[in-house]
Amino acid sequence: MQPRVFLAVTLLALLASARALETEDASLLGYMQDYMQGYMEHASKTAQDALTRVQDSQMAQQARGWMSDSLSSLQDYWSSFKGKWSGFGFWDATPEEASPTPAPEGI
């Protein structure tokens, strides 16, 4: 084999292997990009779910606080209202102490 032909074949083999490595690198790069994109989407979804749970928990705590405050306020109002009208004896009577209403005659 002549040195020129050998040199040309060697050069073509090097170019072909370089092209194959470049294609392999490109496919590996594409794979890594897809992998990282999937990872970032998963991490983003996980973070969003965690944030939603925290917000739901905070909203539930705030709602419980509002309900507790409202109930306490209502109890205070009822006690105040009852205290104002307690002088009439209306609130002090129990159902057993209340006199029964007589039945109308003729029934």
Swiss-Prot record:
Q: Name one GO biological process term.
A: cholesterol homeostasis
Keyword check for Signal, yes or no: yes
Q: Under the GO molecular function aspect, what terms does this record hold?
A: high-density lipoprotein particle receptor binding; lipase inhibitor activity; phospholipid binding
The protein in question is named: Apolipoprotein C-III
Q: Show which residues constitute the signal peptide.
A: 1-20
Checking InterPro entries in the record gives:
Apo-CIII, Apo_CIII_sf
Q: SUPFAM superfamilies in the record, alphabetically? A: Apolipoprotein (SSF47162)
Site annotation (May interact with the LDL receptor): which residues? K45
Q: Which organism is it from?
A: Heterocephalus glaber (Naked mole rat)
Q: Encoded by which gene?
A: Apoc3
Q: Which residues are glycosylated?
A: T101
